[in-house]
Amino acid sequence: MTSPYPRPVGRVVVTGGSSGLGAAVVDAVRAAGGSPAVIDRVPFDDGGATPFAQADVSNHIEVEHAIAAIAAELDGIDAVVTAAGIDRCGTLGEVDAVEWERVIGVNLLGTVSTVRAALPYLEEVHGRAVIVASSLALRGVSDATAYCASKFGVLGFSRALAAETRGRLGVTTLIPAGMRTGFFDDRPEQYKPGADAQLIEAAEAARAIVFALQQPQGVEVRELVICPEEEPSWP
């Protein structure tokens, strides 16, 4: 039996909410009548309108404390969106081992830690987890072994989580193509998108996330691919 549609968005914790896709999700959740909260290493300041906890998602203890603090402030959590992510470009031999493992720590282990910490709150309300993967969770490319490995892992984790928590938690994997955000700003020029690159707007992906959050209990959007109409690399 399903509940009415659209389901209220509710109290949504967004990792990486200070910039990029995460910031767009914060705006979209608020526009849909929800109550966003942010976990990020980078300070988030909108005059106190949005609950914020500073944490490095690769540190599970910091994540646990951040989730607990936000849950206490909001009197619970209805959903999490794992938008925090980083990349280190270069061949396997070129990327320092510590930096390579850092990508896994943030993208994969940070996702796991966030969901694990939020799970007790989410299961109380049959909440939702929207887990952000990437089109590079479906195909491998050169000079991106860390990022591809992390996102392949995120996709596998999300699918297994959906099976493990069926009937208790809604799980959606978002699979976005490249987005027009600051994600590429610190890359060497050879790894930045070209002037003719087909990128989606973060706000478009954020609206898709809200769509998943609004699905009634009993209806699941398991995987959602967001890409340009003429996506050249799909799949």
Regions found by a protein language model. Give the residues of each.
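Conserved glycine-rich cofactor-binding loop
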Residues: 18-19
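The beta1-alpha1 cofactor-binding region of Rossmann-like NAD(H)/NADP(H)-dependent oxidoreductases
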Residues: 55-65, 97
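Conserved NAD(P)H cofactor-binding loop of Rossmann-fold oxidoreductase domains
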Residues: 83-88
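Substrate-binding pocket helix/loop in short-chain dehydrogenase/reductase
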Residues: 91-92, 99-101
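Active-site helix of classical SDR
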Residues: 115, 150
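Residue(s) in the substrate-gating loop at a strand-loop-helix junction
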Residues: 134
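C-terminal helical subdomain
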Residues: 173-174, 193-234
